[in-house]
């Protein structure tokens, strides 16, 4: 499908077990039982069968630390599936099953039940992975942006196994970007 930035062949999924997890702090983390020995690196996406879980932030040889969506400094580029408008998620630190969807302009139609998916605009996640569903969308006359609450797809209270996403195309993107930069400097 031409809307995807990367081919499905560009993505490899590495299974891992969650061996540590917090859900009641402002800065929550997950620990998984896979690390650099298994091909895990920083900035890899993490999902489960329900949707997006988080992003790898630190790696040792046998383990990795994951920043989940329920971390107050985590933002994720996503889109409304029905109209393709792009926003970003933000967790307020209150409810481990809810996120805020920000940067959706007032002229965009947003309905309860709308599906929110990854945008595919970064090399971390392919486009179309479920993030959550719109639970509430409010707009006052003075607002330029919607106030949108999402029900997170992944249930952190039942998290046991995840998959770490390796984007095989990332190396090619970085190589071609660097080649373009260097070729421009040589002239």
Regions found by a protein language model. Give the residues of each.
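A secondary-structure micro-motif
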Residues: 2-187
């Amino acid at each position: 499908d031409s809307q995807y930035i990367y081919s499905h062949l560009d993505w490899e999924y590495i299974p891992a077990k969650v061996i540590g997890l917090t859900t009641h702090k402002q800065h929550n983390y997950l620990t998984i039982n896979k690390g650099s020995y298994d091909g895990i690196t920083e900035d890899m996406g993490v999902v489960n069968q329900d949707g997006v879980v988080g992003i790898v932030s630190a790696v040792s040889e046998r383990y990795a630390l994951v920043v989940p969506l329920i971390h107050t400094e985590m933002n994720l580029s996503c889109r409304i599936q029905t109209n393709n408008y792009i926003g970003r998620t933000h967790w307020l630190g209150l409810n481990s099953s809810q996120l805020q969807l920000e940067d959706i302009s007032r002229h965009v139609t947003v309905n309860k039940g709308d599906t929110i998916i990854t945008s595919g605009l970064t090399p971390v996640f392919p486009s179309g992975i479920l993030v959550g569903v719109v639970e509430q969308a409010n707009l006052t006359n003075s607002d330029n942006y919607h106030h949108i609450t999402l029900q997170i797809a992944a249930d952190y209270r039942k998290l046991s196994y995840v998959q770490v996403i390796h984007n095989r195309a990332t190396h090619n993107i970085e190589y071609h970007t660097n080649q373009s930069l260097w070729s421009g400097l040589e002239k």
